Structures are given as C-alpha cells and as structure tokens.
Swiss-Prot record:
Part of the 30S ribosomal subunit. Contacts proteins S9 and S11. This is Small ribosomal subunit protein uS7. The keyword Ribonucleoprotein applies. It holds the Pfam family Ribosomal_S7. One of its GO terms (biological process) is translation. GO terms for cellular component: small ribosomal subunit. It comes from Hyphomonas neptunium (strain ATCC 15444).
C-alpha cells in the first residue's frame, strides 16, 4: 500500500430506475465477474418481490434494512506489549454503509431460497423488521465491542 498517494474515491452514478446512489453501491456488491446487467436484474427483481409481498416502497424497505444492519461500533486488533487486544472503536459513516451493504449481500447469499432475487427480497424484508442473519451479524459485532469495553482506552 502506497504511503504517498491514496486512491481517489470514484464517483458512483445513481441507478437508472430509482436514481439512488446507495442502490447502485448495493448492485455493485451483488455483481459478480463484472456482470452489471445480471446484478441489476437480481436487485430490481428482488425490489419487485418486496413491493408485491410487503406492499411498501422497496427503496424505503431497502434503506430501513441498511439502517438496521449498519454497525455503530466494531472491534479492531491492537497489539500492546506482546498481547493483542480487541479494542472497540466507532465506525465512520462511510464504513457503516459499506459494511451494511456487504453484510446484507452475504446474508442473502447464505439463505436457502431458490433464486438470488428471492433470497435478497427475503433478507431485505427480514432486516427491515430487525430479523435475519445480517442483523444478527450487527448484534454480534456490538456484543464483541461491549465485551471488550475495558480496552477502550487503547483506542487510536
């Protein structure tokens, strides 16, 4: 990793259907092997399923799910005199969003419905109601941070 120059942030364009940048970021996370059109079909298909099942605006459900999954604190390893401590630190806004997107996509992939759009729709609806594996991941992360509160003074 270069110490001189950090890579500049690329601008993410809003998605064509909902004009939402976060939906595009989610699509990019779902995308495999550069197949954006496949990812687009999966995400929009999942949103259609959410709309028919939940009778709500799918983008609102998506944003609620992200909010329910985004962690406030996480633990980072810090080495102090031969011992490694798990130090709880607050999560920056950008990283919160990135982690929430990543965890939602991973939790959806781990479900056992037939198609990815069904898995995604199920996970989005579960997460927006405070259930599902992505929310469990957030709670586990918070629990770890809480358990290691004693090492908070090692923060950097």
């Amino acid at each position: 990793m270069s110490r001189r120059h950090s890579a500049e942030k690329r601008e993410v364009l809003p998605d064509p259907k909902f004009k939402d940048i976060i939906v595009t970021k989610f699509m990019n996370q779902i995308m495999r092997d550069g197949k954006k059109s496949v990812a687009e079909r999966i995400v929009y298909g999942a949103f259609d399923l959410v709309e028919t099942r939940a009778k709500k605006n799918p983008v609102e459900v998506f944003h609620n799910a992200l909010e329910a999954v985004a962690p406030a604190v996480e633990v980072r390893s810090r080495r102090v005199g031969g011992a490694t401590y798990q130090v709880p630190v607050e999560v920056r806004t950008e990283r919160r969003q990135a982690l929430a997107i990543r965890w939602l996509a991973a939790a959806a992939a781990g479900r056992n419905e037939n198609t990815m759009r069904e898995r995604l729709a199920g996970e989005l609806m579960d997460a927006s109601q405070g259930r599902g594996n992505a929310v469990k991941k957030r709670e586990d992360t918070h629990r770890m941070a809480d358990a290691n509160k004693a090492f908070a003074h090692y923060r950097w």
